[in-house]
């Protein structure tokens, strides 16, 4: 049995899903638990829900997939700011400290948050990052009738 926990967080509409042998067992958006529309925080309650629904402990999950690669997003962000410079400089100046301090190093952030679900979760190597646009494509393709 192969289990995958999918996580979307820190942008908008945080959510979690769990797949077992390629089949979606449960999925939930964090806003359903926090009642905060478009909640961007770490989806603690959504993860708790999908794990409980699937009757799986976090330590037993084979892979944890985050919806995007932080360095690719940072690269896109820089390209956008350069393309529109000097417009948007205030936004750029505000965003950079957050990116340089936290967002580029999300693997450690995710690991620390995941430990809140299961203190025995110790394998940071289970955390992977997918390309954002491939995540969108996969969410459309895999449940479709196409092979």
Give the residues covered by each predicted segment.
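Short acidic/glycine-rich loops and adjacent helix/strand connectors
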Residues: 1-147
């Amino acid at each position: 049995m192969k289990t995958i926990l999918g996580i979307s967080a820190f942008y908008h509409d945080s959510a979690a899903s769990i797949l077992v042998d390629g089949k979606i067992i449960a999925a939930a958006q964090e806003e359903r638990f926090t009642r905060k529309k478009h909640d961007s925080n770490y989806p603690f309650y959504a993860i708790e829900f999908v794990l409980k629904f699937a009757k799986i402990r976090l330590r037993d999950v084979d892979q944890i997939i985050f919806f995007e690669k932080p360095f690719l997003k940072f690269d896109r962000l820089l390209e956008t700011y350069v393309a529109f410079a000097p417009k948007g400089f205030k936004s750029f100046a505000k965003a950079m400290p957050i990116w340089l301090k936290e967002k580029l190093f999300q693997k450690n952030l995710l690991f620390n948050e995941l430990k809140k679900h299961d203190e025995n979760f110790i394998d940071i190597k289970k955390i992977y990052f997918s390309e954002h646009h491939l995540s969108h494509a996969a969410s459309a393709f895999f449940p479709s009738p196409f092979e």
